[in-house]
């Protein structure tokens, strides 16, 4: 009988990626097969997130439910990973002594040894929440594609130390994967028919990966190299930081058509005073200047962002500045949250002087405004021709197919299942609140998807690029040095 593994994942897309790698690793080394049923599992892992309020208590509530399973099955292995584990490892050990393995985001590659150690020494537990230098990627098996789109982590951690954020304390400072490792993983995915990659990192555009000859590959260089990989026709990335959005990255949008017309660039607030309190390192006008440059190159670029509502000291004027920035930029989507203090962060020491009622009212107004903008953009797409990557059957109607536009809109349409994993052109016939409908007008066999520039030319261009200094970009935003 095969051994079963159950993983529950909370939080960001990086956590989703890490959970996928855990499953692949434990399958390759120990033959564990994933199950959706925790009661059927031999190993249960909880991959946690510490961004939201009461994250720790949520973890202990979940562990309390799993303790009942362990009472009935003493050999069950329970592990806790992710950012809460990194931040609260000792507390988890004390409050939940039945947990066998506690590991951080940078030590998940050691899971097979940890589990083996616990199984060999009944009643013992293992805690490893250290920050080894991104060695986990050297220990992971070859990636397994799950559809035509895939996530690839290119760097870990963040060195910006925004006053509200726990990431530098839970995932460590910025460390980039060597460029050859990233390109190999993407090439392996392309061989498995992946057509779109989404590059992941807490501060992805701060990427500075080592090359085989001891040089530094910057994020803009990396994008050009990825675009040269045969079969990769779309490139996305998340999450980026405005301070790191240098001119060379703006320039990539002019000469790499594989880079999509959609950008997620968190701003958090439109008030310079609040941005300063957050230690974001830029102003609202500098943020908008970057967007203006991008839209000169890509007029149809759609934007999404993160917003924190009710940061300590936020006045009505500060909130109005955020609403003005939203109107000026024209966001398509947002991840917006009411501020809650994270233990150990500098902002936790500030007086939380915005009432809950004010926070809720402001959040409602902000989300309503962005929803209106998103609906307007959807209506503007009516009767336009859109190229979409077909991901699979529609989630609501299995007789239809589902694809995604460059600007990250889901389109449902009727078509043959043979086009799953391929690009098709559709004409948008209906704009719904959360998706679009379209009619199939062209399949990939009728397109010319060959790039006009040969891959060798792209590689030559990337190799000839001069190193970029970590100084000041064109709009006067200094690269942050902690």
From Swiss-Prot:
- Report whether rRNA-binding shows up as a keyword of the record: no
Give the EC number(s) under which this enzyme is classified: 2.8.4.3
Catalyzed chemical reaction(s): N(6)-dimethylallyladenosine(37) in tRNA + (sulfur carrier)-SH + AH2 + 2 S-adenosyl-L-methionine = 2-methylsulfanyl-N(6)-dimethylallyladenosine(37) in tRNA + (sulfur carrier)-H + 5'-deoxyadenosine + L-methionine + A + S-adenosyl-L-homocysteine + 2 H(+)
State how the cofactor is bound: Binds 2 [4Fe-4S] clusters. One cluster is coordinated with 3 cysteines and an exchangeable S-adenosyl-L-methionine.
Provide the MTTase N-terminal domain boundaries: 3-120
Q: TRAM domain spans which residues? A: 379-442
Quote the record's binding site residues for [4Fe-4S] cluster 2. 158, 162, 165
Task: Give the molecular function GO annotations.
Answer: 4 iron, 4 sulfur cluster binding; metal ion binding; N6-isopentenyladenosine methylthiotransferase activity
Q: How does it assemble?
A: Monomer.
Please describe what this protein does.
Catalyzes the methylthiolation of N6-(dimethylallyl)adenosine (i(6)A), leading to the formation of 2-methylthio-N6-(dimethylallyl)adenosine (ms(2)i(6)A) at position 37 in tRNAs that read codons beginning with uridine.
Protein's name according to its UniProt entry: tRNA-2-methylthio-N(6)-dimethylallyladenosine synthase
């Amino acid at each position: 009988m095969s051994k079963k593994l159950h993983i529950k994942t909370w939080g960001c897309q990086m956590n989703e990626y890490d959970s996928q790698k855990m499953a692949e690793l434990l399958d390759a080394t120990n033959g564990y097969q994933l199950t959706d049923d925790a009661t059927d599992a031999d190993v249960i892992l909880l991959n946690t997130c510490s961004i939201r309020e009461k994250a720790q208590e949520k973890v202990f509530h979940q562990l309390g439910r799993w303790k009942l399973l362990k009472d009935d099955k003493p050999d069950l292995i329970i592990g806790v990973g992710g950012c809460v584990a990194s931040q609260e490892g000792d507390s988890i050990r004390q409050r939940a002594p039945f947990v066998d393995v506690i590991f951080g985001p940078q030590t998940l590659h050691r899971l097979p040894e940890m589990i083996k150690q616990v199984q060999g020494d009944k009643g013992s537990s293992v805690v490893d929440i250290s920050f080894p230098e991104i060695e986990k990627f050297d220990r992971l098996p070859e990636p397994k594609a799950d559809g035509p789109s895939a996530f690839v982590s290119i760097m870990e951690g963040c060195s910006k130390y925004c006053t509200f954020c726990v990431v530098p304390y839970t995932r460590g400072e910025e460390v980039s994967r060597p460029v050859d490792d990233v390109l190999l993983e993407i090439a392996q995915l392309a061989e498995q028919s992946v057509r779109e990659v989404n590059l992941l990192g807490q501060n992805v555009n701060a990427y500075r990966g080592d090359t085989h000859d001891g040089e530094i590959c910057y994020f803009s260089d990396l994008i050009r190299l990825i675009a040269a990989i045969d079969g990769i026709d779309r490139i996305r990335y998340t999450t980026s930081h405005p301070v790191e959005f240098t001119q060379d990255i703006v320039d990539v949008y002019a000469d790499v058509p594989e880079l999509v017309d959609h950008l997620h660039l968190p701003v958090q607030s439109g008030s310079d005073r609040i941005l300063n309190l957050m230690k974001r390192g830029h102003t609202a006008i500098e943020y908008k200047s970057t967007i203006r440059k991008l839209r000169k190159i890509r007029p149809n670029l759609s934007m999404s962002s993160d917003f924190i509502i009710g940061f300590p000291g936020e006045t009505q004027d500060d909130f109005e500045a955020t609403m003005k920035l939203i109107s000026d930029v024209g966001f398509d989507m947002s991840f917006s949250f009411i501020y809650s203090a994270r233990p150990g962060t500098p902002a936790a020491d500030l007086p939380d002087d915005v009432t809950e009622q004010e926070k809720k009212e402001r959040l409602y107004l902000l989300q309503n405004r962005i929803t209106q903008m998103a609906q307007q953009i959807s209506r503007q797409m009516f009767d336009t021709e859109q190229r979409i990557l077909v991901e699979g059957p529609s989630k609501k109607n299995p007789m239809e197919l589902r694809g995604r536009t460059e600007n990250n809109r889901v389109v449902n349409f009727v078509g043959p299942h043979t086009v799953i994993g391929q690009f098709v052109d559709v004409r948008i016939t209906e704009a719904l609140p959360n998706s679009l409908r379209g009619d199939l007008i062209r399949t990939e066999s009728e397109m010319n998807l060959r790039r006009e520039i040969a891959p060798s030319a792209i590689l030559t261009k990337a190799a000839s690029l001069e190193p970029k200094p970590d100084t000041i970009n064109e709009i006067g935003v200094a690269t942050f040095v902690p």
